[in-house]
Regions:
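Alpha-helix N-cap/helix-initiation sites
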Residues: 24-28, 51, 69-73
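Winged-helix/helix-turn-helix nucleic-acid-interaction surface
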Residues: 1-6, 10, 55-126
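Short recognition helix of helix-turn-helix/winged-helix DNA-binding domains
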Residues: 1-45
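A Lys/Arg-rich helix-loop hairpin that forms a DNA/phosphate-binding surface
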Residues: 43-55
Length: 126
């Protein structure tokens, strides 16, 4: 999946506000970078797992945020505490699973299927 939904009201979400409060806009940027990485490389929407079903390497997740490791760890703590990331998946596998991203992708896919629409390819590729 190479897309995800980002609403204009995202900064007002309490889970996102907690990130901004603790880490500032740098933390928000890191979170968006992580969302992009998971959307682009994840096997399933919202799940930071590769094509074999293995969690992404921790170094790749840290690099995707652009944050130093200490701030990445703080970001993960905030997101698992708030429920933005599934805590159980992080604790067991050091994997990132974002339920909201998964739900939104499912809704979008159902909407496309029911209306027989396909995503627009802005690159002009068939």
């Amino acid at each position: 999946v190479k897309w995800f939904q980002l609403d204009a009201d995202a900064p007002d979400d309490p889970k996102i506000r907690a990130v901004v409060y603790a880490l500032g806009v740098e933390g928000f940027g890191g979170l968006v970078g992580l969302w992009c990485h998971i959307a682009k490389h994840g096997r399933r929407p919202g799940q930071g797992i590769d094509s074999r079903g293995a969690p992404f390497p921790l170094d790749d997740l840290v690099a995707a945020t652009g944050l130093p490791a200490s701030k990445f760890n703080e970001l993960v703590e905030i997101c698992t505490r708030s429920g933005h990331f599934r805590r159980d998946v992080w604790q067991m596998y050091r994997g990132v699973w974002i339920p909201a991203m998964e739900r939104r992708a499912d809704r979008y896919s159902r909407k496309l299927a029911s209306s027989s629409q396909l995503p627009i390819d802005w690159a002009g590729q068939p």
